[in-house]
Regions:
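Short, conserved catalytic/metal-binding motifs centered on acidic residues
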Residues: 13-21, 57, 103-111, 126, ...
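Extended, non-catalytic structural segments that build the interaction scaffolds
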Residues: 197-222
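An internal, acidic/charged active-site-proximal segment
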Residues: 72-189, 275-286, 311-314, 325-332
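Basic, amphipathic alpha-helical segments enriched in Lys/Arg and hydrophobic/aromatic residues
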Residues: 241-270, 283-285
């Protein structure tokens, strides 16, 4: 199975991220908890609303479009709930089972010793952005990662895309150790993009400048999973469900995931493919080419299906009832 997936997906990089489903006016939903509302929160202010956590793991297709391999809506109010980490571990185990060995790209929210230890246990590679609180073992003592960051300057110049804009960045790296097990890793530093240089921890081997650049590119391609969440919420009205049971909510999420997978399938088709050409014609996009085509594909499919007033029942052959004529068996 993993061999077949390797043929479809561009690189065996798995992106894990958390999102939220907010139901501020909900009262009857099962196990409704409090979540951080990402649309209202800022760097200086955190807003909490009633809702659910969503943990998603995605991979990229050959044309750089995300496909989900794990998606779960969960809440700390559930009876058998243990921790958010356990849900994340399930996503990691799913990725390891599908691909054998992959690279996990994760944001600062996953800078946790438990995450590093779990990935080491599964024998997986990772690229995880570190927080300012992280301490690393360097030259026989524990030092703040920010201290190592401030002592260095980027020597490797490259162009990186961040939040839709291209930036000239400088990269540097240093060999350090992490967690109580003191595993050897590399700290990759990215200067020139954010106010404070980014700190990326990776256990991937670095033998050349190209390896350093590839590690940075792996992390910065994370924006596609964030766009995946936005597309789910906008095109499928993800937060507008009415079912109350958590199992039913996850069932709806599963069907949306299938729809998103179909969009990924169509995005890989040639521009001359008859169905894709019809979808694009109906979508009537303003821009000829975009990096993320799910929106226009979903719009085109929605436009085509808007003509289907009778549903799908007319596509099936009608079963005619058997003749109800009275039959008499004649005997000689």
């Amino acid at each position: 199975e993993s061999r077949g997936l390797g043929d479809v997906y561009k690189r065996q990089v798995i992106y894990i991220d958390d999102s939220d489903v907010v139901k501020p006016d909900g009262y009857k939903f099962e196990a409704l908890g409090l979540v951080r509302d990402g649309s209202k929160s800022t760097a200086s202010k955190t807003v909490y609303e009633k809702g659910y956590h969503v943990t998603e793991a995605c991979v990229l297709t050959k044309n750089n479009h995300p496909v989900s391999i794990f998606s779960k809506i969960h809440s700390s109010k559930e009876k058998n709930f243990t921790s958010n980490n356990d849900v994340t571990f399930s996503a990691m185990e799913r990725g390891a089972a599908l691909f054998g060995k992959a690279t996990f790209a994760m944001d600062r929210g996953y800078d946790d010793n438990k995450m590093f230890l779990k990935l080491d246990e599964l024998q997986q590679d990772y690229v995880i952005r570190l927080t300012a609180k992280r301490k690393l073992f360097f030259h026989g003592k524990w030092v703040p990662a920010t201290q190592l960051r401030n002592q260095r300057k980027g020597k490797i110049k490259t162009t990186l895309t961040y939040k839709g804009q291209k930036h000239e960045a400088c990269l540097s790296h240093v060999k350090v150790q992490i967690t109580a097990s003191k595993k050897d890793i590399y700290l990759v530093l990215v200067y020139g993009i954010t106010e404070h240089p980014m700190m990326l921890a990776t256990n991937k081997k670095i033998k050349s400048k190209e390896d350093v650049v590839n590690i940075a590119l792996t992390y910065f391609s994370r924006w596609r999973i964030e766009e995946y969440f936005r597309c789910k919420k906008q095109m499928f009205q993800f937060e507008n469900f009415r079912v109350r049971k958590l199992a039913a909510i996850n069932a709806l999420n599963f069907y949306i995931t299938l729809c998103m997978a179909f969009l990924a399938h169509m995005s890989m088709k040639s521009e001359t493919h008859a169905l894709k050409a019809a979808i694009m014609q109906k979508a009537d996009p303003i821009k000829e080419k975009v990096q993320f085509s799910y929106y226009r594909l979903a719009k085109g499919i929605s436009g085509i299906l808007s003509y289907a007033k009778e549903g799908i029942r007319l596509w099936f052959r009608t079963k005619r009832p058997s003749y109800r004529q009275l039959c008499l068996k004649l005997t000689a």
